[in-house]
Amino acid sequence: MKGTPSFGKRNKNLHIRCRRCGKNSYHVRKKVCAACGFGRSRRIRRYSWQNKKITGQRLK
């Protein structure tokens, strides 16, 4: 058997499916979605660094 005794404790669902965004990111104990911010704010959590920037330059 591999791993330390602490690894045996890692068998519970920390995140469940979010009601608002549908991703598996709703933290059960915190009651906050890590993906969309549901439970923390009414606004959808969005950042500019989430998507890659398109420079418009082609490689030669």
Curated annotation (Swiss-Prot):
UniProt cross-references to SUPFAM superfamilies, sorted A to Z: Zn-binding ribosomal proteins
Record note on cofactor: Binds 1 zinc ion per subunit.
HAMAP family registered for this protein in UniProt: Ribosomal_eL37 (MF_00547)
Example GO molecular function: zinc ion binding
Entry keyword set: Metal-binding, Ribonucleoprotein, Ribosomal protein, RNA-binding, rRNA-binding, Zinc, Zinc-finger
Annotated residues for binding of Zn(2+): 18, 21, 33, 36
Function: Binds to the 23S rRNA.
Keyword Lipid biosynthesis among UniProt keywords: no
Pfam families per record: Ribosomal_L37e
InterPro entries on file: Ribosomal_eL37, Ribosomal_eL37/eL43, Ribosomal_eL37_CS, Ribosomal_zn-bd
Required co-factors: Zn(2+)
Recorded family membership: Belongs to the eukaryotic ribosomal protein eL37 family.
UniProt GO BP: translation
Zinc finger (C4-type): 18-36
Protein source organism: Methanothermobacter thermautotrophicus (strain ATCC 29096 / DSM 1053 / JCM 10044 / NBRC 100330 / Delta H)
GO cellular component term of the entry, any: cytosolic large ribosomal subunit
Name listed for the protein in its UniProt record: Large ribosomal subunit protein eL37
